[in-house]
Amino acid sequence: MASKFLREYKLVVVGGGGVGKSCLTIQLIQSHFVDEYDPTIEDSYRKQCVIDDEVALLDVLDTAGQEEYSAMREQYMRTGEGFLLVYSITSRQSFEEIMTFQQQILRVKDKDYFPIIVVGNKCDLDKERVVSEQEGESLARQFGCKFIETSAKSRINVENAFYDLVREIRRYNKEMSNPSGSGAFGARAPDSKMDVSEPGESAGCCGKCIVM
C-alpha cells in the first residue's frame, strides 16, 4: 500500500552541452525520444511517481550545458536536493567536466557530500565509446556516489537513474536527521555500479508514474 503523503523532490540534471540531458528528462516525463538537438536554457518538468511504496512528486530541472550559461548554475544548485551529473560516453570532454560540476555543487552547498549520481549517457552508441564503463565507476567511487549508464534513445535505465537519485535523497535526509547514528554521511560509498537493464525494462525499479 503506497503512502498517501506527497513529498516533492527537486532534481537537477547537470552536464555539458549535447550529452542528452533533455533527452533523458523528456524520456522520463513523456516516454519518447527527441531526435533534434535544441540547446536548453532551462526547462522544468513535474511528474508524480510511487517509488518503493512512497508517493513522490519529481520536480526535474533540465539545465543549460553551454558555458555561456554557467552564471545560472549556482542559482539552481542552491535549490536542488539531488543532482544527476550526466556525460556522454562518446565525449571525453563531457566526462572531464563532471568533476567541475561536482566540486561546484559541494562548494555551493558547503557540504562534503550531497546526493549525486554519475550518469554515462548514450550507452547505445557503444561503437563510438571513448569513456569506458570502468572510468565512470572509478569517478563515482571517488565521489562516494552511485554510477549508472543510460540510453535515452533506447530507454535503458532512464527511470533507474532518477528513481535511485530519489532514494539517495531519502537516505541522505535520514542520515542528516540522525547524526548520532552511523556517523557522518558519505563515510561509506554506496554501491558504485548498477545493472544496465535491457531496453524498455526498469530493473530494480518499484514505481509507477503520472505526468503532472
Curated annotation (Swiss-Prot):
Classification via InterPro entries: P-loop_NTPase, Small_GTP-bd, Small_GTPase, Small_GTPase_Ras-type
Q: How is its activity regulated?
A: Alternates between an inactive form bound to GDP and an active form bound to GTP. Activated by a guanine nucleotide-exchange factor (GEF) and inactivated by a GTPase-activating protein (GAP).
GO biological process per UniProt: conidium formation; regulation of conidium formation; signal transduction; spore germination
Q: Does the keyword Nucleotide-binding apply?
A: yes
| UniProt short sequence motif Effector region, positions renumbered to this chain | 37-45
- Show the GO cellular component annotation of the record: plasma membrane
Sites of S-palmitoyl cysteine lipid attachment are 205-206
Q: Which domain of life is it from?
A: Eukaryota
Q: Which reaction does it catalyse?
A: GTP + H2O = GDP + phosphate + H(+)
Short name of any one Pfam family annotated for the protein: Ras
- Residues bound to GTP: 15-22, 62-66, 121-124
Q: Name one molecular function that GO assigns to this entry.
A: GDP binding
- The keyword Transmembrane is assigned to this record: no
Identify the keywords attached in UniProt to this record, alphabetized: Cell membrane, GTP-binding, Hydrolase, Lipoprotein, Membrane, Methylation, Nucleotide-binding, Palmitate, Prenylation
Pro-piece positions: 210-212
The UniProt entry, under Gene3D superfamilies, shows: P-loop containing nucleotide triphosphate hydrolases
Entry's family note: Belongs to the small GTPase superfamily. Ras family.
Q: Which NCBIfam families match?
A: small_GTP
**By what name is this protein known?**
Ras-like protein
Q: Which organism is it from?
A: Emericella nidulans (strain FGSC A4 / ATCC 38163 / CBS 112.46 / NRRL 194 / M139) (Aspergillus nidulans)
